[in-house]
């Protein structure tokens, strides 16, 4: 009989998290035995809660909002992609009390974009937001060699800092990322729009670029039972292929699960179908 692997997710809020069900389904497909729990915390208590979790036998944890960037400062070692992102969504214990911080968000997004037939290479992208979520996906998007990536953030200084960090790391040429404080300032047709802000959580509409390509597509990292406000905006603007971040959620979770449990990647198609079926 397999021993039970203790896993969890830290966030605030956290009661809504689908991670326990997703990982339970992964375990079902691989016949693993896991115990995956939600952990509510605050920024002040987050380091202690994480330390307690692993001290009491935790074997892996996810980190969600608002702790992804804080988690990057807690770990002993960062993976290359987590270092590039400046944010961590996966904690992996190794050695005596040591923690590796990784970030599977970008990988999850790229896999889901490919599943949906959305190509990034040589395309013009507009990414809304410059926070932890954007940091997690932009390095992986850049690896796909888009023609140009517009980073849209109300606080242009924050976006410029992110661009500068990426340039310093040698990940992007100076002309590959263009910063705009509003999408209205973009003066070329955009092929793919990605919302990495929390605007959809409060029903906030974003200003879209004035020019969209004929086959423009859109992706909201947020997800809900109904189309998000951002998705509705894009549909109204004529985008043909519009998706929420549910597929990314499943794919990044599968990457985390594989890091903890080893062996093959879980069957995400099965989990996606099960999660979309009303319980």
UniProtKB/Swiss-Prot annotation:
<feature type="binding site">
    <location>
        <position position="221"/>
    </location>
    <ligand>
        <name>NADP(+)</name>
    </ligand>
</feature>
<keyword id="KW-0028">Amino-acid biosynthesis</keyword>
<keyword id="KW-0521">NADP</keyword>
<feature type="binding site">
    <location>
        <position position="89"/>
    </location>
    <ligand>
        <name>shikimate</name>
    </ligand>
</feature>
<feature type="binding site">
    <location>
        <position position="245"/>
    </location>
    <ligand>
        <name>NADP(+)</name>
    </ligand>
</feature>
<dbReference type="GO" id="GO:0050661">
    <property type="term" value="F:NADP binding"/>
</dbReference>
<comment type="similarity">
    <text>Belongs to the shikimate dehydrogenase family.</text>
</comment>
<dbReference type="InterPro" id="IPR022893">
    <property type="entry name" value="Shikimate_DH_fam"/>
</dbReference>
<feature type="active site" description="Proton acceptor">
    <location>
        <position position="68"/>
    </location>
</feature>
<dbReference type="Pfam" id="PF01488">
    <property type="entry name" value="Shikimate_DH"/>
</dbReference>
<feature type="binding site">
    <location>
        <begin position="153"/>
        <end position="158"/>
    </location>
    <ligand>
        <name>NADP(+)</name>
    </ligand>
</feature>
<comment type="function">
    <text>Involved in the biosynthesis of the chorismate, which leads to the biosynthesis of aromatic amino acids. Catalyzes the reversible NADPH linked reduction of 3-dehydroshikimate (DHSA) to yield shikimate (SA).</text>
</comment>
<dbReference type="GO" id="GO:0009423">
    <property type="term" value="P:chorismate biosynthetic process"/>
</dbReference>
<dbReference type="InterPro" id="IPR036291">
    <property type="entry name" value="NAD(P)-bd_dom_sf"/>
</dbReference>
<dbReference type="InterPro" id="IPR006151">
    <property type="entry name" value="Shikm_DH/Glu-tRNA_Rdtase"/>
</dbReference>
<dbReference type="Pfam" id="PF18317">
    <property type="entry name" value="SDH_C"/>
</dbReference>
<dbReference type="Pfam" id="PF08501">
    <property type="entry name" value="Shikimate_dh_N"/>
</dbReference>
<dbReference type="InterPro" id="IPR013708">
    <property type="entry name" value="Shikimate_DH-bd_N"/>
</dbReference>
<feature type="binding site">
    <location>
        <position position="223"/>
    </location>
    <ligand>
        <name>shikimate</name>
    </ligand>
</feature>
<dbReference type="GO" id="GO:0004764">
    <property type="term" value="F:shikimate 3-dehydrogenase (NADP+) activity"/>
</dbReference>
<keyword id="KW-0560">Oxidoreductase</keyword>
<dbReference type="GO" id="GO:0008652">
    <property type="term" value="P:amino acid biosynthetic process"/>
</dbReference>
<dbReference type="InterPro" id="IPR046346">
    <property type="entry name" value="Aminoacid_DH-like_N_sf"/>
</dbReference>
<feature type="binding site">
    <location>
        <position position="64"/>
    </location>
    <ligand>
        <name>shikimate</name>
    </ligand>
</feature>
<feature type="binding site">
    <location>
        <begin position="129"/>
        <end position="133"/>
    </location>
    <ligand>
        <name>NADP(+)</name>
    </ligand>
</feature>
<dbReference type="InterPro" id="IPR041121">
    <property type="entry name" value="SDH_C"/>
</dbReference>
<dbReference type="GO" id="GO:0005829">
    <property type="term" value="C:cytosol"/>
</dbReference>
<dbReference type="GO" id="GO:0009073">
    <property type="term" value="P:aromatic amino acid family biosynthetic process"/>
</dbReference>
<dbReference type="InterPro" id="IPR011342">
    <property type="entry name" value="Shikimate_DH"/>
</dbReference>
<feature type="binding site">
    <location>
        <begin position="17"/>
        <end position="19"/>
    </location>
    <ligand>
        <name>shikimate</name>
    </ligand>
</feature>
<feature type="binding site">
    <location>
        <position position="80"/>
    </location>
    <ligand>
        <name>NADP(+)</name>
    </ligand>
</feature>
<comment type="subunit">
    <text>Homodimer.</text>
</comment>
<keyword id="KW-0057">Aromatic amino acid biosynthesis</keyword>
<protein>
    <recommendedName>
        <fullName>Shikimate dehydrogenase (NADP(+))</fullName>
        <ecNumber>1.1.1.25</ecNumber>
    </recommendedName>
</protein>
<dbReference type="GO" id="GO:0019632">
    <property type="term" value="P:shikimate metabolic process"/>
</dbReference>
<feature type="binding site">
    <location>
        <position position="105"/>
    </location>
    <ligand>
        <name>shikimate</name>
    </ligand>
</feature>
<comment type="pathway">
    <text>Metabolic intermediate biosynthesis; chorismate biosynthesis; chorismate from D-erythrose 4-phosphate and phosphoenolpyruvate: step 4/7.</text>
</comment>
């Amino acid at each position: 009989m397999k021993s039970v692997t203790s896993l969890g997710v830290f966030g605030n809020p956290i009661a809504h998290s689908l991670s326990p069900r997703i990982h339970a389904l992964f375990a079902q497909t691989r016949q693993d035995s896991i115990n995956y729990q939600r952990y509510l915390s605050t920024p002040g208590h987050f380091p202690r809660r994480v330390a307690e979790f692993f001290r009491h036998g935790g074997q892996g944890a996810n980190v969600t909002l608002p702790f992804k960037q804080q988690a990057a400062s807690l770990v002993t070692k960062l993976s290359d992609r987590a270092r590039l992102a400046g944010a961590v969504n996966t904690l992996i214990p190794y050695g005596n009390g040591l923690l590796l911080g990784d970030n599977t968000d970008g990988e999850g997004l790229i896999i889901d974009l490919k599943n949906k037939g959305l190509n990034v290479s040589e395309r013009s992208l507009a990414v809304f937001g410059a926070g932890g979520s954007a940091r997690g996906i932009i390095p992986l998007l850049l690896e796909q060699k888009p023609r140009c990536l517009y980073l849209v953030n109300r606080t242009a200084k924050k976006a410029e800092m992110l661009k500068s960090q990426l340039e310093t790391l040698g990940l992007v040429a100076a002309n590959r990322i263009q910063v705009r404080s509003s999408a209205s300032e973009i003066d070329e047709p955009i092929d793919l729009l990605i919302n990495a802000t929390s605007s959809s959580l409060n029903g906030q509409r974003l200003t879209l670029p004035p020019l969209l390509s004929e086959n423009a597509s859109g992706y909201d990292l947020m997800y809900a039972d109904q189309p998000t406000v951002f998705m509705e905006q894009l549909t109204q603007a004529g985008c043909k292929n519009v998706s929420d971040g549910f597929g990314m959620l499943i794919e990044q979770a599968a990457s985390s699960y594989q890091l903890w449990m080893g062996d093959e990647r879980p069957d995400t198609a099965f989990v996606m179908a099960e999660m979309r079926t009303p319980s």
